[in-house]
A protein has these predicted regions:
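Core of compact, soluble alpha-helical bundle domains
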Residues: 1-140
Length: 140
């Protein structure tokens, strides 16, 4: 029996390391970081870890908002979504994640594009609309 994608990725410690590196990579990427200017990075970290863990067959349960609701009003372009995917692939490469596993993760996350992208444009680096309401911070 083949191990789950979660297990092949290295479990919770590996997923956490990948998410933290990815979050930092996105924060440094001028093509997309304006969309995260008002984001609670602690919340983002937790939500991403839970989402990736659950999506790959791990024991976590993602309890955040749907991708459509979470990104509604952000004005995310196709170009910005593609830049985010490029950052994710670069993160996977940094951690020597195998091509098979990368493909499986991208196959799970790729369909979310239609829920996240609001503008069919190759433009990147667009600001977060002033009217966008960010999620509340996690209780600490």
């Amino acid at each position: 029996m083949e191990r789950s994608l979660y297990e092949r990725l290295g479990g919770m410690d590996s997923i956490t390391a990948v998410v933290e590196n990815f979050r930092d990579r996105v924060a440094a990427d001028d093509r997309i970081n304006k969309k995260f200017a008002r984001t609670d990075l602690v919340r983002l970290r937790k939500m991403l870890i839970d989402q990736v863990c659950e999506a790959t067959g791990g024991p976590c349960q993602y309890t955040g908002r749907s991708m459509k609701v979470a990104h509604e009003g952000m004005g995310v372009t196709s170009g910005e979504f593609d830049a985010l995917v490029q950052d994710l692939v670069a993160t996977f490469d940094h951690f020597n994640v195998g091509q098979k596993e990368q493909g499986e993760v991208l196959a799970v996350l790729g369909p979310l594009k239609t829920e996240i992208v609001e503008l069919d444009s190759s433009q990147v680096g667009t600001p977060l609309p002033a009217a966008y309401e960010v999620a509340s911070a996690l209780a600490r």
